[in-house]
C-alpha cells in the first residue's frame, strides 16, 4: 500500500508492481499443489548444489575451518576452541565430524546434508502451518535460499534463521513455552536471537508467562551446560571476541571507502584480519567506525523503545511481532561495522513465517489485505537484496579484495558498484520495515488501540 502522493517512479510504487507481478506468476492451483511445491523445492536446491560444485567450490572454506577446529578440539580442549562462537556451537559442529568419521570430505558432506535436512523440515512446517498462505510461505523460503546460494548450506546461520521462524510458528499455534525455548536455543548458537524475546509477548498474561519461562529455563540450561563443559572464560569469550574488529568491506558503512578505493587504491588497503574477515583501512575509516558504534547502540535503543511502546499499547497482533523481529534484525545489519553474506539469512526464517501468520487470519477484514500488500513488498526487497548479496559473494568477491593483476583492477569497479547497490537495497529494506512499524506505533495508532482497550474493559 503506497501513500496517495506516491508517483509511478517511487520505490514504493515500483516494488508494489514488481511484487504483484511476481505473485501472479504462481497461480492459486500451483500454490495449493504439494507436488508442484516439492518439485520447485528440489529444483531450487539442485541449482544451489550445482552452483557450489561447479562454479563456487571455494565457498566451503568456512566448513573446512569448522572441521579444522573440531579436529583439534580433543587436544586443545573446548576452552580454546571456536572462541568466537557460543559454547553450544561446538556441540553442533561436532555432529558432522562424527557422521563424517573424522574425514574432511565426509565432514563437508555431512554438514551440507544437515543443513539440507533442516531446510526441508522448515519448508514442511511452513506448508502445514501456513493455512491459506502455506504455499506462499514455502515459495518465499525456497526462493530466498536459492538467492542466498551455496552459502545457505555452508554456514550454520541457517540454524538461527530457522529457529527464529519456528518460534513464530509455535507462537502461532499457541505453544508459547516452546517458542520461548526455541528463541533461547537460537541465542545459544548466535547471540542476537536473545533480542527477539520481547516479540514473543503479544498475547494475554498467561502466554507471556509461558513464553518467558520457556526462554529463561532453556537459556539457563544452556548457560549451565556451557559452564560445566568449557568454563567461565569460554562462556564469555564471544562477548569480547568482536571488540577489536575493523570496518568489514561489505558493511553499509564501508560503501563510500570502497567506492573511493576504485579511483584511488593507493590511499586504501584491504586486509584479512584475524577474525577471518576482509577489512578496509584508509582516510575517514576511523570516523566511520566510531559512527557505526554510535548508530548500532542507538539502533538497538530504538528497537527496545519500540518493544516497550508496543507492549504498553497492548493488543499486539502476531504479524506486528514478526515486523518487530525483522526491525531488530535489519537494524543490526545496517548499523553494524561488520556484514558477512550469511547475515542475510537471518531475515529469511521470520519472513517466511510471516506468510504462515497471515494464512491463518480471516480474509474478510481490511487489515489482512493491507498486511499482505506490505508483506509482499518487503519480501520482494529482501529477495532483491539477497540476490545482490549472492552476486557480491561469492561471484565477484575476488575483485573486491585482490590486487594481483590488471584484470582484478579493471573488474573492481563493477564489483564495487554491485556491493553499493546491495547496500542501498538493504537500507531500503530498513526503511520499509520502519514504515511498517510506524504504521502501528505512531501516536495516533497507539492512542486508538488504547482507547479501544478502555472501551472493552469499561464496565457496562
Regions found by a protein language model. Name each.
Residues 67-80, 239-285, 293, 420-423:
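Luminal/periplasmic active-site loops of membrane-embedded glycosylation enzymes
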Residues 13-240, 288-460:
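Multi-pass membrane glycosyltransferase architecture that uses lipid-linked
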Residues 3-10:
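Compositionally biased low-complexity segments, especially N-terminal hydrophobic helices
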